[in-house]
């Protein structure tokens, strides 16, 4: 809703008096090959993942530039660096968010506004559970790192959520990156290794993905920050 977005900065300022940080984090996906994806599904993901980021940034940027120090934080993904099958629309949005944000980093140099592009690795969220699945007639679910080919959508979503870094830890990494003025913020060792792999072997990184994901999945800290015992 572009009109609602245009009105949002004034509502925020009326309630809080100022705005210093804008986090563009909303994201959805669809599990579908490109040839069988209905156009409305494609457009919906583009609207949420890309146009939402652009419209929110456009709406808030004039107010942020009036602050002595401010930041825009846009969430891309490791899927803004690499590509896998059945995620063409998600990749299209996340590569675009990356390009948009990195251009904005350069445009905002010399102003009071920092701009950050976030590349999360495997974070334990409900994005896979909430994803629409579109399969051609007779097509089975592809086997993946997180489950069997015959696993249900719910089982795959549960495995994805339970084996990822807890979202509270991801949030802490983002805040630390903003404080340290990092234009690129990688969340998790998997994100850092994937970035390295696609730089070293841009056409064959997919063969390295199991070696990256599986060991990290076993040792990743999945506890929420608030669940950790207090230090003595």
Name each region found by the language model.
Residues 57, 93:
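Active-site helix of classical SDR
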Residues 1-7, 39:
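The beta1-alpha1 cofactor-binding region of Rossmann-like NAD(H)/NADP(H)-dependent oxidoreductases
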Residues 110-189:
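SDR active-site lid
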């Amino acid at each position: 809703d572009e009109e609602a977005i245009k009105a949002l900065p004034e509502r925020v300022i009326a309630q809080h008096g100022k705005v210093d940080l804008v986090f563009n984090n909303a994201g959805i996906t669809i599990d579908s090959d490109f040839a069988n994806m209905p156009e409305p599904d494609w457009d919906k993901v583009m609207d949420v993942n890309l146009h939402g980021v652009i419209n929110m940034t456009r709406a808030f940027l004039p107010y942020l530039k009036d602050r002595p120090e401010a930041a825009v934080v846009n969430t891309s993904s490791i899927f803004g660096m690499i590509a896998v099958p059945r995620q063409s629309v998600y990749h299209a949005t996340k590569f675009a968010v990356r390009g948009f944000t990195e251009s904005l980093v350069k445009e905002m140099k010399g102003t009071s506004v920092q701009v950050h592009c976030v590349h999360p690795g495997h974070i334990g969220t409900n994005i896979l559970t909430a994803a629409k699945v579109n399969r051609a007639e007779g097509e089975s679910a592809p086997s993946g790192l997180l489950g069997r080919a015959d696993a249900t959508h719910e089982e795959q979503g549960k495995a994805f959520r339970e084996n990822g870094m807890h979202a509270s830890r991801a949030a802490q990494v983002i805040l630390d990156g903003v404080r340290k003025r990092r234009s690129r913020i990688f969340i998790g060792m998997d994100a850092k290794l994937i970035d390295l792999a696609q730089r070293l072997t841009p056409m064959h990184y997919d063969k390295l993905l199991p070696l990256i994901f599986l060991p990290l999945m076993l040792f990743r800290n999945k506890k929420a920050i608030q669940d950790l015992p207090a230090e003595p």
